[in-house]
Amino acid sequence: MKNLEQTWRSILDEFHQQANLREGHIVVIGCSTSEVAGRRIGTSGSEQIAEAVYKGLEELRDRTGIALAFQCCEHLNRALVVEEETAKAYRLPVVFAIPVPKAGGSMASYAYKHMKAPVLVEQIEADAGIDIGDTFIGMHLKPVAVPVRVSQKQLGEAHVTLARTRPKLIGGVRAVYEAE
């Protein structure tokens, strides 16, 4: 578990540097703890792995002021666990269910139990995202998503994909995108 935690912190450090995360940004996290453990998604959830992932994200949140949004599994329509203050600040309509490992997933369930005032929302437009185990978080990212490449491409046995977003470039041939 120690190696997993070190790898995770390394991934988060590189992600933070490249994605330019700061206060006011929302980061969506999709995590299959089963995939991290080398099993098929949705079959072998692990609270121990969820705890390690959550703690690393808490540290990142405390350092940067970002808001975290944990994606539930398909059984809860990929709803997101966020702090109530995040839902209010971003005017996100709250829905209700209590994520549990078999309906929501171990990661979302762990987050729900350990956040100060957790609520569920159906949609979000996050500024950045972390997908551990191919959970498909793209539906919750703002357009335009830009891949973030880090040196570690796996957490345990799970494939890790990271993204940041940028504003759409508008205009035509006369548009200017860089300040002189």
UniProtKB/Swiss-Prot annotation:
UniProt cross-references to HAMAP family, sorted A to Z: UPF0340 (MF_00800)
Transmembrane feature ranges: none
Top-level division of the source organism's lineage: Bacteria
Family of this protein: Belongs to the UPF0340 family.
Disulfide bond positions: none
Name of the protein this chain belongs to: UPF0340 protein BLi03936/BL03990
InterPro entries: Antibiotic_NAT-like, DUF436
